[in-house]
């Protein structure tokens, strides 16, 4: 086995092991920083925040992070905060359904199984009672480097698909005002502004900002 073949073999295995490590490793505990003691004093101007037309209202934008919707969510957040001063806009991930998330965790295991079968099938098949490996195994074995690379790429694509929810859900004060899952599209800025205005506890008046 020459140097090029070793690289082609090692790269997919390294990336696959990296995916498995990131998937099953729990996130590190958040370090608790000691905040310096705050000096409590009364200021003359904090009441300005309460004069904003959006003060006291909360908008939640739950979107699919793995679908690259973050840019759209941030743009909508900035627009709403500029139109409704004082409005609290919260961005959060909208996860895929539980069955899809479970299948997404199975994919890396299947990738390891397929790659292991390609590399050591001649020993694995007799262990499970199959004396002669099937014809499809010989086809994969004949081009084992391409087969392993394809297994890794297709597995990553499938895992990304299973982790995607395709959601862009907007709620105002706990009430759903727009759902991409139902509408099949993103909301327009003017449309979203009007939806939020009709749901706020302090109605938005044109020209009041």
Curated annotation (Swiss-Prot):
| Signal sequence range | 1-22
Keywords tagged on the record? Disulfide bond, Redox-active center, Signal
Q: Which residue pairs form cystines in this protein?
A: 64-67
Q: Which Gene3D superfamilies match?
A: Glutaredoxin
Q: Which Pfam families match?
A: Rdx
- What PANTHER family would the database entry show? SELENOPROTEIN T, SELT-LIKE PROTEIN
What protein family is recorded? Belongs to the SelWTH family. SELT subfamily.
**What protein is this chain from?**
SelT-like protein
